[in-house]
Amino acid sequence: MSAEEAIRGAMAEVPKAVAAGLVDMGSGMMLSIKTVDSHPQAVLDILAPATKEMFEGEMVTTIENLFKKARGVESAEHYFREILVASTNLWHYFGRLKSNEEIVLVVVCRADVNLGMLVMKARQVAHNATV
Protein backbone atom coordinates (compact mmCIF):
# COMPACT_ATOMS: atom_id res chain seq x y z
CA MET A 1 0.00 0.00 0.00
CA SER A 2 1.42 3.37 -0.98
CA ALA A 3 1.37 6.43 1.25
CA GLU A 4 -1.24 7.99 -1.04
CA GLU A 5 -3.47 4.90 -0.77
CA ALA A 6 -3.24 4.98 3.03
CA ILE A 7 -4.20 8.65 3.07
CA ARG A 8 -7.11 8.10 0.68
CA GLY A 9 -8.25 5.28 2.96
CA ALA A 10 -8.06 7.50 6.04
CA MET A 11 -10.04 10.26 4.35
CA ALA A 12 -12.71 7.77 3.21
CA GLU A 13 -12.91 5.64 6.38
CA VAL A 14 -12.47 8.05 9.29
CA PRO A 15 -15.69 9.96 9.94
CA LYS A 16 -15.66 13.73 9.44
CA ALA A 17 -12.01 13.68 8.34
CA VAL A 18 -10.87 16.98 6.86
CA ALA A 19 -7.17 16.11 6.51
CA ALA A 20 -4.83 13.14 6.72
CA GLY A 21 -1.11 12.66 6.35
CA LEU A 22 1.80 10.33 6.98
CA VAL A 23 4.92 11.52 8.77
CA ASP A 24 8.29 9.75 8.54
CA MET A 25 9.77 10.12 12.02
CA GLY A 26 13.25 9.16 10.83
CA SER A 27 13.55 12.00 8.35
CA GLY A 28 11.01 14.33 9.95
CA MET A 29 9.35 14.66 6.55
CA MET A 30 5.74 14.45 5.42
CA LEU A 31 5.34 11.44 3.11
CA SER A 32 1.87 12.37 1.90
CA ILE A 33 -0.93 14.73 2.85
CA LYS A 34 -4.49 15.37 1.72
CA THR A 35 -6.78 18.09 3.00
CA VAL A 36 -10.24 19.29 2.03
CA ASP A 37 -9.45 22.84 3.16
CA SER A 38 -6.64 25.16 2.25
CA HIS A 39 -4.06 25.60 4.99
CA PRO A 40 -1.16 28.05 5.13
CA GLN A 41 1.98 26.43 3.74
CA ALA A 42 3.81 27.41 6.93
CA VAL A 43 1.45 25.16 8.93
CA LEU A 44 1.95 22.24 6.55
CA ASP A 45 5.72 22.77 6.65
CA ILE A 46 5.93 22.36 10.43
CA LEU A 47 3.42 19.52 10.82
CA ALA A 48 6.03 16.77 10.40
CA PRO A 49 8.62 18.25 12.81
CA ALA A 50 5.86 19.03 15.34
CA THR A 51 4.65 15.42 15.14
CA LYS A 52 8.19 14.16 15.67
CA GLU A 53 8.57 16.45 18.68
CA MET A 54 5.32 15.15 20.25
CA PHE A 55 6.38 11.52 19.91
CA GLU A 56 10.15 11.68 20.24
CA GLY A 57 11.05 15.03 21.76
CA GLU A 58 13.71 15.18 24.46
CA MET A 59 11.30 15.18 27.40
CA VAL A 60 9.13 12.43 25.88
CA THR A 61 12.09 10.12 25.34
CA THR A 62 13.29 10.92 28.87
CA ILE A 63 9.91 9.80 30.25
CA GLU A 64 10.03 6.64 28.13
CA ASN A 65 13.55 5.85 29.33
CA LEU A 66 12.58 6.41 32.98
CA PHE A 67 9.67 3.97 32.59
CA LYS A 68 11.96 1.41 30.96
CA LYS A 69 14.55 1.79 33.71
CA ALA A 70 11.91 1.46 36.46
CA ARG A 71 10.58 -1.71 34.83
CA GLY A 72 14.00 -3.17 34.06
CA VAL A 73 13.29 -3.12 30.33
CA GLU A 74 16.05 -2.75 27.76
CA SER A 75 14.36 -1.94 24.47
CA ALA A 76 14.38 0.59 21.67
CA GLU A 77 10.59 0.31 21.46
CA HIS A 78 8.61 3.52 21.89
CA TYR A 79 5.91 3.47 24.56
CA PHE A 80 3.85 6.30 23.13
CA ARG A 81 1.75 4.81 20.31
CA GLU A 82 -1.12 7.27 19.87
CA ILE A 83 -1.90 10.87 20.73
CA LEU A 84 -5.29 12.57 20.51
CA VAL A 85 -5.35 16.38 20.61
CA ALA A 86 -8.41 18.62 20.85
CA SER A 87 -8.25 22.09 19.33
CA THR A 88 -11.02 24.67 19.19
CA ASN A 89 -12.78 23.21 16.14
CA LEU A 90 -10.99 19.95 15.43
CA TRP A 91 -9.70 16.64 16.78
CA HIS A 92 -6.19 15.58 15.74
CA TYR A 93 -5.29 11.87 15.86
CA PHE A 94 -1.65 10.76 15.67
CA GLY A 95 -0.83 7.04 15.63
CA ARG A 96 2.18 4.93 14.73
CA LEU A 97 1.69 2.39 11.95
CA LYS A 98 1.73 -1.23 13.06
CA SER A 99 3.95 -2.22 10.12
CA ASN A 100 6.51 0.53 10.78
CA GLU A 101 6.50 2.52 14.02
CA GLU A 102 8.69 5.17 12.39
CA ILE A 103 5.67 6.25 10.33
CA VAL A 104 2.86 8.19 12.03
CA LEU A 105 -0.64 8.54 10.63
CA VAL A 106 -2.17 11.97 11.23
CA VAL A 107 -5.94 12.41 10.83
CA VAL A 108 -7.79 15.66 11.50
CA CYS A 109 -11.57 15.59 12.02
CA ARG A 110 -14.28 18.14 12.78
CA ALA A 111 -14.91 18.65 16.50
CA ASP A 112 -18.36 17.03 16.36
CA VAL A 113 -16.92 13.63 15.35
CA ASN A 114 -17.77 10.60 17.46
CA LEU A 115 -14.42 10.08 19.21
CA GLY A 116 -14.85 6.33 19.49
CA MET A 117 -15.40 6.04 15.75
CA LEU A 118 -12.49 8.38 15.03
CA VAL A 119 -10.07 6.29 17.08
CA MET A 120 -11.42 2.94 15.86
CA LYS A 121 -11.29 3.85 12.17
CA ALA A 122 -7.91 5.60 12.42
CA ARG A 123 -6.50 2.54 14.21
CA GLN A 124 -7.78 0.31 11.42
CA VAL A 125 -5.99 2.44 8.85
CA ALA A 126 -2.78 2.51 10.96
CA HIS A 127 -3.02 -1.27 11.48
CA ASN A 128 -3.51 -2.09 7.79
CA ALA A 129 -1.18 0.47 6.18
CA THR A 130 2.13 -0.90 4.92
CA VAL A 131 4.17 2.08 3.83
Predicted regions and their residues:
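Non-catalytic interaction/Regulatory regions outside core domains
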Residues: 1-131
